[in-house]
Each structure stands twice: as structure tokens, then as C-alpha cells.
């Protein structure tokens, strides 16, 4: 938090877990597909592999997780050194676009966890990158998506990316609009992506 009281963070720490970078150099034993000059992202999470969450196939919920930019110094620096196994290179994706993968993935994961199908009406509150990920993934699964935000430009993007309906919660009554859109049934799934 801005007050520095997040119990997960050990200060001081360099932030930065949404990583888009270009590989500067590689060490010995690094596979040939990881080459200097190649844009990449970094998997920012390091799981222990032995806690109950890891043993149950949920390394994202590892009790001893070490995330770049949270528990370990992150990418808001000129250079970072990372194990090659964390590097995801692709010469076709820019480092700027790579930085969007982590937050988009959070939205995609929320849709998977919500088991959203083409039978669902999904309300996504917040049209930042996590919300956009949820909107895109829900639309790809055939759900009817209702995007809610206070920013008309974000709502316009949400519409272009698959939202069937948009609601500006600053200028419209959300409850009334939901009732109109859903014939008084409301959404089947709500994803809060405001933070």
C-alpha cells in the first residue's frame, strides 16, 4: 500500500512484477531459444513446490511464494538477473506488449476459476488490464459481458473487445441498468477488477 504496511512486502524492495524486457545477456547452460536482443516477459512467481498449495497443483497460492517486485526486488530497474527457467521469449511480441501479459492473465484466470460458459451473463467491474483480460476471456467463452467503469474510453475499449453492454457507474444507475439488461435476473458471475 502507499503507507508501506502490506504484510507481504519486506521493505525496501524494488517494485515491478508486470515485466516486459529485452534479454541483454545470457549465462552458461542457457537453452539456445533464449538469445540476447529478444523481447521477453518473466514469470514473476517462485513457488516452493512442497507446501499444501503446491502439492495440490496450485503453485499460484504457494504459502512461501517469492514474487519479483513484492518479496524480491522487481523489474523497475535498468537490469535484473533471473533464472532462465523464468524467461518467456518471443521475437514477435514487443517488450511493451509483454508487460501486459501478467495482468491480462489474472483476468483470464478469474474467468477459468469462475467456470464461465456461454450460458452466463458476466459483470466485470473495472476495465483496467485485469478487467480487460476477464472481458476478453468471457467473450471468447461465449458469455454475455457487462462492463462497468467510470471512464468512457475504457468502456469503449471493453465494447470493442467483446463486452455486449457497458455501464458508466459515474453517470448511470448500475442497479437499474442491470435489471434492464438482464430482465431482472442480474448477472450469473461478477468479477471485481477495480483493486
Task: Please state what every model-predicted region is.
Residues 3-52, 91-93:
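Glycine-rich beta-strand-centered segment in the early N-terminal region that forms part
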Residues 44, 170, 194:
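Glycine-rich, N-terminal phosphate-binding loop of Rossmann-like dinucleotide-binding domains
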Residues 48-125:
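NAD(P)H dinucleotide-binding glycine-rich loop of Rossmann-like/cofactor-binding domains
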Residues 78-79, 144, 165, 189:
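Well-ordered beta-strand positions
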Residues 93-172:
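Mid-domain Rossmann-like dinucleotide-binding core that forms the NAD(H)/NADP(H) cofactor-binding site
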Residues 172-184:
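Short amphipathic alpha-helix with an adjacent loop that forms part of the alpha/beta core around
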Residues 185-191:
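Short SAM/SAH-binding signature in class I
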Amino acid at each position: 500500500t502507499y503507507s508501506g504496511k502490506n504484510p507481504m512486502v519486506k521493505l525496501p524492495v524494488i517494485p515491478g512484477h508486470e515485466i516486459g524486457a529485452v534479454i541483454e545477456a545470457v549465462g552458461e547452460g542457457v537453452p539456445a531459444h533464449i538469445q540476447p536482443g529478444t523481447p521477453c516477459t518473466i514469470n514473476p512467481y517462485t513457488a516452493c513446490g512442497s507446501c499444501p498449495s503446491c502439492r495440490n497443483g496450485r503453485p499460484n497460492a504457494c504459502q512461501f511464494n517469492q514474487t519479483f517486485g513484492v518479496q524480491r526486488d522487481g523489474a523497475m530497474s535498468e537490469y535484473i538477473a533471473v533464472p532462465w527457467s523464468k524467461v518467456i521469449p518471443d521475437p514477435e511480441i514487443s517488450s511493451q506488449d509483454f508487460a501486459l501479459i501478467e495482468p491480462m492473465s489474472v483476468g483470464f484466470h478469474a474467468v477459468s476459476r469462475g467456470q464461465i460458459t456461454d450460458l452466463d451473463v458476466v459483470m466485470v467491474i473495472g476495465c483496467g488490464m485485469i478487467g480487460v483480460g476477464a472481458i476478453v476471456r468471457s467473450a471468447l467463452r461465449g458469455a454475455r459481458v457487462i462492463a462497468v467503469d467510470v471512464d468512457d474510453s475504457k468502456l469503449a475499449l471493453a465494447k470493442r473487445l467483446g463486452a455486449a453492454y457497458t455501464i458508466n457507474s459515474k453517470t448511470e444507475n448500475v442497479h437499474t441498468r442491470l435489471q434492464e439488461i438482464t430482465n431482472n435476473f442480474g448477472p450469473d458471475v461478477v468479477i471485481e477488477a477495480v483493486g
